[in-house]
Amino acid sequence: MATVDRWLLPDGIEEVLPPEAARIEVVRRQMLDLFQRWGYAFVVTPHIEFLESLLTGAGQDLDLRTLKVTDPLSGRLIGFRADITPQVARIDAHTLRREGPCRLCYAGSVLHAKPRALSTSRSPIQLGAELYGDASPASDVEVISLMLEVLEQVAVPDVHMDLGHVGIYRGLARAAGLSGEVEQRLFDALQRKAVDEVEVLTAVLPTAQAAMLRALAELCGGREVLDLAQACLVDAPAEVHAALDELIAIADSLGVRYPELPLYFDLSELRGYNYHTGVVFAAFVPGVGQSIAQGGRYDDIGADFGRARPATGFSTDLKTLVTLGQVAPAEPVVGIWAPDSHDVYLWQMVQRLRRQGERVVQALPGQRIDAARAGGCDRQLLLSDGQWQVVPLAL
């Protein structure tokens, strides 16, 4: 193997060096503290699991993003987690088994078999929060508000929100009696806003049903879209009206809390259609071609773990937040240089300083004082009149 091959990393996998790593860790700690103030308890999930457990309740998209290997101990397939959300749902449904609302949060590395988009990392640091046990729009408003607080904490500029509801399309498709194949093809066409394809696929339906499905491709824009949707979908089934009412209630609450926040509605936005069951939302910023934070309601996932629970939540990537946000550089690394000595009184002084929060770097055999600056030290310990004292570093 050539020397150059020994330090090459797989595509989409990167090292994080000290200055950037320090910024990421500062933001991670700030976000977990923020979650704690909102009542969310921190959990840590395994990096690898048996595939059956890891993909339970998840859609095909997660299966495709999961890197799989054979466990040498059991011979079974195991996967590296590509999304922490299903793992946290299992903790709520199977491990904790609490009654009533349960708020959980997490932060950890995930691994994707393929990057989410061109030139993106395959090893993001996923940060998120989940609220279980409440099916009301108030829970969706809470997690969206918390997501916006996260973006505000790191000063991500010019954020705008996309909102949709998969229950609207699902209700219309169910009422139309579409086959699984046609429903999937129509879903794909709506995602691409391919109006001509939508018309062809709905041509065999009764006029009223076809018109409502075709309208979804055009129902995108500002707050006025919701009023237009109420008119276009007046003949829709009750479940569609319930979904639209939920979306309106959430939009109204966000408008009160964040009157300056641009809200964009897209009723054919079906991100996570096979996974989500209600409102879906995402935050975008100009110049970035994909969402920087996203989430939605996924009430069905708990059933796969033996206990169906309403659930809603969001996730984001810490690396992206630090890159896009206005995060202050880490404080300059300073410290105290201690000489290479076996003096027990020096050792006691070093330990006392460290317990007080000081950074103390002990010289190794053969190191000279000029290594102190390279070690980030601006002071040193000197023996004066039989006492070890902290003095400015003099080179």
From Swiss-Prot:
It comes from Azotobacter vinelandii (strain DJ / ATCC BAA-1303). The gene is hisZ. The keyword Methyltransferase does not apply. CDD domains: HisRS-like_core (cd00773). Pathway: Amino-acid biosynthesis; L-histidine biosynthesis; L-histidine from 5-phospho-alpha-D-ribose 1-diphosphate: step 1/9. PANTHER family: HISTIDINE--TRNA LIGASE, HISTIDYL-TRNA SYNTHETASE. This function is generally fulfilled by the C-terminal part of HisG, which is missing in some bacteria such as this one. Pfam families: tRNA-synt_His (PF13393). Belongs to the class-II aminoacyl-tRNA synthetase family. HisZ subfamily. This is ATP phosphoribosyltransferase regulatory subunit. GO terms for biological process: L-histidine biosynthetic process. One of its GO terms (cellular component) is cytoplasm. Required for the first step of histidine biosynthesis. May allow the feedback regulation of ATP phosphoribosyltransferase activity by histidine. Gene3D superfamilies: Bira Bifunctional Protein, Domain 2. It is found in: Cytoplasm. Its main location: cytoplasm. The lineage of its organism: Bacteria, Pseudomonadati, Pseudomonadota, Gammaproteobacteria, Pseudomonadales.
